[in-house]
């Protein structure tokens, strides 16, 4: 027999960003505990609103499954005499296991015969196990910022106010936070607070819906989207898909009702982002667009309640937005009273990081490093004054009133203000785009100024923080250095930038020294740690793109200082693996790698001392392969280089078939090892083949 179970944790309003991770964690923990407690069920599901986390188990068994354990005892020879009589060993083992000696069985184990005791533990009724199991579920949940309340020791996302636990119609008396679970829940805080009795687990959803709570977040999300899109259409426009905002609103309301509002069309004269940011990021409103992609003076929001009095609610939302837009219009007007360039000296008032100076000092470092990168990347010389100016103005909007009020607009407002001041289009684009990509999967800069200054900005931050010892540990990354490093890797890979990460780290480090800032850690330590840090980000990027782990490791073992080259070597080796005959070639190269590594030192190859026909032919093949492969390696065409190297397979096989590498004569041996080392050095420019899995 089986029954459904509902377990609800009622709380004060939990922040929306906590909800999805908590529900996923709750489902995973419950599934694991059900296995450990031997309680099978048909389905594990979790639901949530701002005021509750709910676990629903469909068709949960009424009893634990029987536990059967087979415990190994002494060998049969030691347990029984030749005529089958139990020895003291068998009797003692049976007694210790609590079974009769006649119940011992024989099993084969590691090639021998042993006696085993079979112990059976009857399953307990689920109702006796569930209080412990459900309490364990709650205790396993973790939140970014848990809190305590009253004199209780428990920590949770927000104070727990009630518990409901029903197994069918039977209450499970879970005790937690000074509360005991009952069959009562609470409805919408204002429309039907309750308490409300839930007769059975399966009635839970209906009882809540009757009391203005849609507990199923998936249904709530779908309903919100249908209401929003329908309302936008009736308003003569459309809303764009915004999964993040939709997700947030889903966990801000229990009984959603969408409503429309309007604002003064005069505000449409402001930059689009200035209108949208207060609307979306601060008020959680959806902007409305016309068919031509133009912003309309309308918005749609979601009310936590019924459709009663929507007109009054809409007017209230309009007043709030009008005040924010009026502030934004004022800031926009005031900020443009002085040129953006005139604001740069004020960056001296903003601390970048306590031990790394001010934002003005960072600006000067960016100018220096951006110019260095133009030269390093072999970009056109006419780009130098453009990136220098972009770097000078990139952070200037941090001192504007608009960005102070709306930090999300940094870079965006600088771009608008620079355009107002008559700066070059390339500079305006660079100011806006140097923050791109802001996160994994975000858009990339499409201007060289944005790409170069963005790369310089990230390198400066990474080098400064690593130099100051501010390295991420575990989940702690207060300066978002993982995101910064991912940005460096992504830009290098997507723009196919050819540069030495080690050298660029040195250039960034020198910027601190030149500015009078002595970093706590020496350059060589920063280089070693930061190259490894970026390598990990590259490895993660490659794994996300679906490349095999062994291919990634083989290519990164051959070097990751040139990030783009390491990426493209992985891509091309992955493609080459699919070619016919690759397995045999891999075997040949791996044999060469393994033998060459047995050498205690690097040997000088003397072609004239090659004695056997097979080794002489291998040398000639190596010279021809070098001639074919090296231009392709320099050009970054690693697939073509690999195809050229494939010509070595036959000569390598013949060499190993006919030549004794470890010859008694040390000069002959060392020369043959030198030949293999030369092959390895060529192939190692792409990958360490010995790391590939057949």
UniProtKB/Swiss-Prot annotation:
GO cellular component assignments: cytosol
Catalyzed chemical reaction(s): tRNA(Gly) + glycine + ATP = glycyl-tRNA(Gly) + AMP + diphosphate
Record GO terms (molecular function): arginine-tRNA ligase activity; ATP binding; glycine-tRNA ligase activity
EC number: 6.1.1.14
Disulfide bonds: none
GO biological process, one term: glycyl-tRNA aminoacylation
Keyword Oxidoreductase in annotation: no
A Pfam family that the UniProt record links to this protein: tRNA_synt_2f
EC top class, as a word: ligase
Domain of life: Bacteria
Alphabetical UniProt keywords: Aminoacyl-tRNA synthetase, ATP-binding, Cytoplasm, Ligase, Nucleotide-binding, Protein biosynthesis
Compartment(s) where it occurs, according to its Swiss-Prot or TrEMBL record: Cytoplasm
Protein family (similarity comment): Belongs to the class-II aminoacyl-tRNA synthetase family.
Subunit text: Tetramer of two alpha and two beta subunits.
Protein name: Glycine--tRNA ligase beta subunit
Organism for this UniProt entry: Moorella thermoacetica (strain ATCC 39073 / JCM 9320)
């Amino acid at each position: 027999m089986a029954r459904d179970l509902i377990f609800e944790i009622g709380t004060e309003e939990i922040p929306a960003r906590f909800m999805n991770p908590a529900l996923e964690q709750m489902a995973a923990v419950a599934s694991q505990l059900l296995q450990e407690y031997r309680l099978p069920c048909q389905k594990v599901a979790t639901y949530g609103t701002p005021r509750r986390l709910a676990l629903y188990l469909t068709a949960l068994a009424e009893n634990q499954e029987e536990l059967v354990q087979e415990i190994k005892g002494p060998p049969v020879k030691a347990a029984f005499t030749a005529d089958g009589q139990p020895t003291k060993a068998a009797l003692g083992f049976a007694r210790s296991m609590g079974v009769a000696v006649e119940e011992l069985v024989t099993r084969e184990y590691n090639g021998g015969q042993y006696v085993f005791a079979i112990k059976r533990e009857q399953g307990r009724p689920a109702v006796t196990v569930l209080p412990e199991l459900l309490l364990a579920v709650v205790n396993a949940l973790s939140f970014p910022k848990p809190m305590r309340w009253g004199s209780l020791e428990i920590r949770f996302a927000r104070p727990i106010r009630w518990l409901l636990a029903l197994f069918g119609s039977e209450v499970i008396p879970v005790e937690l936070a000074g509360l005991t679970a009952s069959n009562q829940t609470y409805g919408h805080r204002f429309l039907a607070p309750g308490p409300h009795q839930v007769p059975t687990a399966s009635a839970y959803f209906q009882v809540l819906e009757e009391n203005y709570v849609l507990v199923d977040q998936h249904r709530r999300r779908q309903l919100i989207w249908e209401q929003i899109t329908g309302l936008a259409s009736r308003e003569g426009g459309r809303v764009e898909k915004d999964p993040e905002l939709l997700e947030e609103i889903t966990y801000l309301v229990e009984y959603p009702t969408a409503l429309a509002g309007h604002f003064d069309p005069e505000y449409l004269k402001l930059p689009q982002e200035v209108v949208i940011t207060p609307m979306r990021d601060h008020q959680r409103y959806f902007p409305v667009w016309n068919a031509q992609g133009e912003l309309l003076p309308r918005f749609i929001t979601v009310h936590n309640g019924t459709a009663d009095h929507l007109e009054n609610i809409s007017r209230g939302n309009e007043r709030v937005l009008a005040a924010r837009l009026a502030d934004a219009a004022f800031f926009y007007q005031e900020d443009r009273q002085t040129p953006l360039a005139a604001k740069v000296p004020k960056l001296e008032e903003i601390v970048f990081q306590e031990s790394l100076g001010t934002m003005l000092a960072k600006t000067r470092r960016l100018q220096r490093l951006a110019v260095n990168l133009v030269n390093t990347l072999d970009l056109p010389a006419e780009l130098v004054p453009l990136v220098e100016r972009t770097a000078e103005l990139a952070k200037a909007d941090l001192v504007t009133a608009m960005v102070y009020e709306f930090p999300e607009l940094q870079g965006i407002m600088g771009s608008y203000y620079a355009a107002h001041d008559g700066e070059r289009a390339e500079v305006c684009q660079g100011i806006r785009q140097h923050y791109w990509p802001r996160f994994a999967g975000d858009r990339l800069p499409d201007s060289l100024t944005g790409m170069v200054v963005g790369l310089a900005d990230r390198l400066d931050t990474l080098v400064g923080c690593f130099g100051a010892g501010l390295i991420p540990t575990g989940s702690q990354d207060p300066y978002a250095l993982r995101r910064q490093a991912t940005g460096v890797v992504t830009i290098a890979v997507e723009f196919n930038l050819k540069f030495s990460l080690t050298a660029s780290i040195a250039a960034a480090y020198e910027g601190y020294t030149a500015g009078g800032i002595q970093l706590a850690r020496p350059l060589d330590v920063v280089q070693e740690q930061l190259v490894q840090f970026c390598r990990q980000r590259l490895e993660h990027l490659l794994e996300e793109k679906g490349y095999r782990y062994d291919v990634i490791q083989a290519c990164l073992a051959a070097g990751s200082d040139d990030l783009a080259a390491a990426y493209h070597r992985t891509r091309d080796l992955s493609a080459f693996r699919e070619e016919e005959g690759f397995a045999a070639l891999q075997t040949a190269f791996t044999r060469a790698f393994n033998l060459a590594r047995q050498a205690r030192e690097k040997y000088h190859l003397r072609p004239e001392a090659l004695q056997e026909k097979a080794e002489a032919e291998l040398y000639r093949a190596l010279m021809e392969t070098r001639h074919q492969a090296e231009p392709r390696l320099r050009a970054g065409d690693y697939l073509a280089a690999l195809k050229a190297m494939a010509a070595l397979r036959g000569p390598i096989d013949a060499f190993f078939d006919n030549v004794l590498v470890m010859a008694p004569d040390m000069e002959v041996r060392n020369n043959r090892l030198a030949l293999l080392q030369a092959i390895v050095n060529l192939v190692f420019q792409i990958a360490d083949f010995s790391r590939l899995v057949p």
